Every structure is written in C-alpha cells, then in structure tokens.
Amino acid sequence: EIQRRFLTCGDPSLQCDYGVIMVYGVQFSTIELSSNERPKACSDTEAKNGPSNRCDGNEKCDVATSGSVCDLCNSAYLTNIFLDVTYGCLESKKVTTCEGVVHLECGDGVVFLQKALYGRIDSQTCSQGRPQSQLTNTKCSQEGTLALWSQRCDGKQTCEVNMRVNQISDPCVGTYKYLDVTYICLPAKTSITCEGSTSSLDCGKGVIKVFHANYGRRDGSTCSAGRHELSNQNCLQPKTLDVVKQWCEGKSQCTLGLDPVFGDPCFGTYKYLEVSYTCLGGSPTV
C-alpha cells in the first residue's frame, strides 16, 4: 500500500508499523520571506534523493540529518521546507537454515537483502542433536556476509545463497553455525541489455525509480547465446547504481550507451547491464 506524508524539518520522521520503508518519490517546496529567488541547492539531486538514501530498508528514519535537504535548502529567505514523500511499507521475509544454503524467491518482484548472518548469535537456533560445546559461542558471525550476498542477489527474482561454496573463512572453528537471511521483495521490473548495445528505460507517462543496477556478469545464462567468455560470474561494477540513478531517476525515459559509461570492470568477460526499476504513475516498457 502506497502512503503519502508531508514532512517538515521540525517533524522529519518516516515509520512503518510493519515491514520496512521504500521511498517511491519526493517533491519539496518552501515558504519564502521575500521575493528573492529560491537557492539553487533546493533543486540539487542530493536534496531530492536524501529521503530514499536514508530510509529505504529501515523500519523508521529521520530525513533531516546532517547534509539533508534541511541543510542544503536553508537560507535567510526561507521560513520552512516541506517534503511531500510517497512511500510504501514492505513486508520482510526471514529464512534460517542449518545447512548453509537458502533459496530466495520473489515471484514477480526482485530480491533486496536487509540482513545476513552466517555464524551463531544464540544457543537455541539449529541446536537439535548438537553437543553443548558447539553452541556456547553466541558471538560468532562471518564478516562481510551481507555485502557479499547483496552484490550477488539484489535485483534478481530468485537467488541461491550457498555458504558451502562461498564461505570466505570459518568465523569460529568448533561452533555449529547457521545461515539467517532477511530480505524484501521489491515491486520492480528488470531490464537486461547485452554488452555493445544501448540500454533504454521507458516509463511512458510515469517516472523512473531505480532500485538496483549492475554492469558485469552474475550468472552464466544471461546474454550467453553464442558466447564463451562466461566463466567469471562475479563481475561487478560498483558505480553502476549511482550512474544509472544520475542518468535515469525521475525521468520518463533514458538511454545509456554501456561501454563508454561503465568502462570494463572485468576484461575478457562478456558483460550485460541489469537494472531493476519501477515506474511511478505509469507502466514500464523495455
């Protein structure tokens, strides 16, 4: 369910009583004390994207933190700043396995990881049939688990998290560990564009909201016809999301030439651009 809230710098909070926040759109305006032109900072991308950057994936947040729109738009000519925020509360899904392998599925949506733990933080989970000596360490966690699997799963409709083949190291030798993953399913579409082509997103009368983007390769089947350079399936371009947001977010349509924009994050691998997005006020066409 999409909700709408008017925020001010004196009351900057968003909260979901259930689920987590996902900001879909932000508009802002000001009341001026004089006829002087509104400061240019009030139309800056950073000011507009602030609520989304601070709130997405959280149960509650304060928009007016350091560097927020309240700082960027502050001037002697303004008495107040109003943020018109459209957002939704998305239900979280939690899966726990003692085997170190979980399958994440989102049907028509796409996966967005919130939390991921590989280790042990209590003595009850996955304890059946295990000796007490394997359960006593409850401060055990594999560092980097969330970052690793966010890179590999975010933006996909389905994803397998397998710590058996992707474990960096053993965070606590002698402790019986489990895998605990919390994620949400974003109501998004996915655009795939193969290397050497031009990517176009079109929302008709709506505007583009980008959730995830990567230029590289995360599986062996996408854009694979007639290609042999597919063995590297962990090819990531970290700047992809920021670039796609800068070019496309808030527009009704946008076009990206892949090679000159993203460079070559993994030489010798045939790459593709994947973008998970939705259309606010319209239906996406690719």
Swiss-Prot record:
Pfam families in the record: SUEL_Lectin
Lineage: superkingdom: Eukaryota
Keyword Repeat listed: yes
An MF annotation (GO) of this entry: melibiose binding
Residue ranges occupied by any SUEL-type lectin domain in the UniProt entry: 96-186, 193-280
Comment on activity versus temperature: Retains hemagglutinating activity after heating at 50 degrees Celsius for 120 minutes. Activity is abolished by heating at 80 degrees Celsius for 90 minutes.
Gene3D superfamilies: 2.60.120.740
UniProt keyword NAD present: no
GO CC annotation terms, alphabetical: cortical granule; cytoplasmic side of plasma membrane; extracellular space; germinal vesicle; perivitelline space
Keywords, in A-Z order: Hemagglutinin, Lectin, Repeat
Function: L-rhamnose binding lectin. Has hemagglutinating activity towards rabbit erythrocytes, but not human type B erythrocytes. Agglutinates E.coli K12 and B.subtilis.
Protein name as catalogued: L-rhamnose-binding lectin CSL1
Source organism of this protein record: Oncorhynchus keta (Chum salmon)
